[in-house]
Amino acid sequence: MSSNKGNGRLPSLKDSSSNGGGSAKPSLKFKPKAVARKSKEEREAAASKVKLEEESKRGNDKKHFNNKNKRVTGAGGQQRRMAKYLNNTHVISSGPLAAGNFVSEKGDLRRGFIKSEGSGSSLVQKGLETIDNGAESSENEAEDDDNEGVASKSKKKFNMGKEFEARNLIEDEDDGESEKSSDVDMDDEEWRSKRIEQLFPVRPVRVRHEDVETVKREIQEALSEKPTREPTPSVKTEPVGTGLQSYLEERERQVNEKLADLGLEKEFQSVDGKEAAAELELLNADHQHILRKLKKMNNKPERFMVFQLPTRLPAFERPAVKEEKEDMETQASDPSKKKKNIKKKDTKDALSTRELAGKVGSIRVHKSGKLSVKIGNVVMDIGKGAETTFLQDVIALSIADDASSAELLGRVDGKIVVTPQI
């Protein structure tokens, strides 16, 4: 037991290790490795060894690539390099671009493909010879080729992407068929036409420039019918000042003369005739509007029109009656008519008194369409007032002491401004 028993504590590890025996030193779990520096001779030997390994690996890769591009031909097992233009290519056996049935003349694996149909054509033969020449040049370039001096010109292949001149093809074909045809006797034009037929089997119709007019005329005579009526007349040009323009100018001159006779420049205090005509048009439009409003008020009794009068009105005077003097003169000459004249006078006075109740003037409509107001013996002009955007009602108020009342008479429909003629 440890000495800490009396204290009530657990024994510590140090106490237990010290009691159990000698203290063991902790050992490292990962020990560093001491790397010794190589000498110069060892480093050079290692570098040369790595270099040799890389060169051997590069040679193996090159040999593998060359073997991949070679194909075994015949029983001798000779390896020949395949032409570069045939890499990543394949023969189409069906479809519009199919190569058809292919045969080989010698039966070896490295053989040219020749279509059985039309294989004797000079174009095919020329292409095969060119391919063989290209294959021979590619064979000379190969480093690991065993048979460098062997040339297989008899091999026949298709031209895959190479071009030839048309003259060379035609010359080859002419050389091959010299025994069967008489091409020697052909002149330049026939030889050129034959070459064009070989290149372009379907010849387009060509027309010389000097024959264009003749061809057009011949086609028109063959397809078009003769006209049965006269040709369409051309557009007729007339001077601008005739017809309607002259009539308008005459009417404008007449209107200006009438305006000058009326003397509207002084009435409207305008500068020129155009301004006077514009003022006259506005005045006529106002009078027509007022006349329509008055007719509408006559049909609808509950409609009223507001008249804006000047602040000072002329004194209303009863018109003098000349008939009274004439009646007094005729009383002595014709006593039998005295009673009738007296009755007529009484009736006129009675009517005049009734008409004057609440009436201060009248609106007159002239033959020209102009409107005017006559108040007493004074004639005034009228014009259209400003329209309101809200409703206005006319109300009659009674302010009697015993009982006051208000009565709605109707609605205001328009406004007229009365101006005196100065």
From Swiss-Prot:
* Organism annotation: Saccharomyces cerevisiae (strain ATCC 204508 / S288c) (Baker's yeast)
Enumerate composition-biased segments (Acidic residues).
Answer: 138-148
The lineage's top-level taxon is Eukaryota
Q: Which GO terms describe its molecular function?
A: DNA binding
Q: Where is this motif: Nuclear localization signal?
A: 25-29
Q: From its record, what is one biological process in GO terms? A: transcription by RNA polymerase III
For the modification Phosphoserine, the affected residues are S137, S138, S178, S182, S224
- In which family does this protein belong, per the annotation? Belongs to the eukaryotic RPC4/POLR3D RNA polymerase subunit family.
Composition bias type Basic residues, residue spans: 28-37
The entry describes its oligomerization and partners as:
Component of the RNA polymerase III (Pol III) complex consisting of 17 subunits. Interacts with RPC37/RPC5. RPC53/RPC4, RPC37/RPC5 and RPC11/RPC10 probably form a Pol III subcomplex.
Q: What else is known?
A: Present with 998 molecules/cell in log phase SD medium.
Q: Which positions does the record annotate as the modified residue Phosphothreonine?
A: T228, T232
Name where it's found. Answer: Nucleus
Q: What is this protein called?
A: DNA-directed RNA polymerase III subunit RPC4
Task: Give me the Gene Ontology terms describing cellular component.
Answer: nucleoplasm; nucleus; RNA polymerase III complex
Mark out the compositionally biased spans (Basic and acidic residues). 38-64, 160-170, 219-229
Question: Which parts of this chain are annotated as the region Disordered?
Answer: 1-80, 115-190, 219-244, 318-350
Q: Which residues cross the membrane?
A: none
> What job does this protein perform?
DNA-dependent RNA polymerase catalyzes the transcription of DNA into RNA using the four ribonucleoside triphosphates as substrates. Specific peripheric component of RNA polymerase III which synthesizes small RNAs, such as 5S rRNA and tRNAs. Essential for tRNA synthesis. The RPC53/RPC4-RPC37/RPC5 subcomplex is required for terminator recognition and reinitiation.
Q: Which UniProt keywords apply?
A: DNA-directed RNA polymerase, Nucleus, Phosphoprotein, Transcription
